Amino acid sequence: MLKIFTTQLTGIFSRIQDKESDAIEDGARLLAQAVISGHSIYLYGANELQGVFYEATESKEPFPSVKAFPENAEEVTESDRVLMFCSGTGTAEEQELAKELYEKGAGVVCVSPAAKDSAGIEQYCDVHIDSKLKMPLVPDEDGTRYGFPSLMTALYVYHALSFTLKEILQEYA
């Protein structure tokens, strides 16, 4: 089972690298605007994806200008940026939040699986990065699947954004 999980997860990471590199660069450029101008990057991740916030703030390589998403979205200004991580295509609440931020003019970078139709959260994002994780990775004998590593794929994209942002900021300095 571990071999299947590892193979499938490696495949997802490869697809993100191959197909989302432009979106990752666009997202990092949008986030760099907040860093360079002295504004905030608010990080949103519900449930298990709160782990991305802890990586961004408590690791040996903290993400610049990052803050926890506030209780009240009205605190986010149009000069701030928002980095949203969603394990699915966006709950109704997440889509409403993204829509509010998008309409306010705060730059929104969202990481989530792409929706099959246009009803996903990406419609309210300035930049959408497809996490490629649409279903659990390991098949069971009865046909069910398990092993849904949403935090692992979110952290992979987070680090890709972090590395790209660092390069952009070094070019700017």
Swiss-Prot record:
One of its GO terms (molecular function) is carbohydrate derivative binding. The lineage of its organism: Bacteria, Bacillati, Bacillota, Bacilli, Bacillales. Pfam families: DUF2529. One of its GO terms (biological process) is carbohydrate derivative metabolic process. Disulfide bonds: none annotated. This is Uncharacterized protein YwjG.
